[in-house]
Amino acid sequence: MRRELATSTMSLSYDDSVQALFRDGEEPVPSVRRLGELEDVVLDRDFFSRAAKDVILYYMFRDLHRREDEELFRGNGIRYDVTIIPPRNLGLEYVKTAGHYHPEASASMSYTEIYEVLNGKAHYLLQKAEGNRITDVLLVEAVKGDKVIIPPNYGHVTINPSDETLIMTNLVSGRFESVYVPYRNRSGAAYYELKDGSFRKNENYGRLPPLRQIMAEKRKWLPREMDLYTLFVTTPGLFKFLNDPSEYSQLST
């Protein structure tokens, strides 16, 4: 069954019977992430050994925009993506993304990113690395309409902790490639979120700070009633921090 998503400028709809996304009536082709590609980051090894490795865990639709907005996105070096994560368990864990960091942009600060939840519920598990140490771990809970900024120097994993399909969008600089190796080398994030609601420390990190849990922050300049795509095409200057993370500290609440 096809359902309309809450985007006012660009028409987006989703058919959960075939995991298809439609943009202005067209059906873009996604990149997919299969279970076998998450081998290094799944906690439950017994589950992984028995599960079909070609099962698709999530769908990534990169660089979506209306034709008339092509110059705006290219000129600003920004990309708009949609990610769809159907509900599933990975043995002991909820379904999750592989996890990645962003490379340094300038002044010892990595590129930032901003997400919006269009359907379902998301847990964004953020961790800050300083050398070989993790100095902060934060779980941000977000629901439909919430927008979450990934600050400079934080890696992140997205978790779908519900029985609904998680559909989220993001705006990000198009000037870099994400860095996945640190997560793979340590068998995932600093903490694993288990399907019983508990969290387990990842012993591959050694000493870890306590996990902090917060709800998505409300910011006046990111109104819930306006979707991320519309915000960008109407006020692209708001998103300079995506290419220049030094602007992040100037953002108001």
Locate predicted features:
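Active-site region of the double-stranded beta-helix
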Residues: 2-142, 160-253
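Histidine-centered metal-chelating micro-motifs
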Residues: 147-148, 152-157
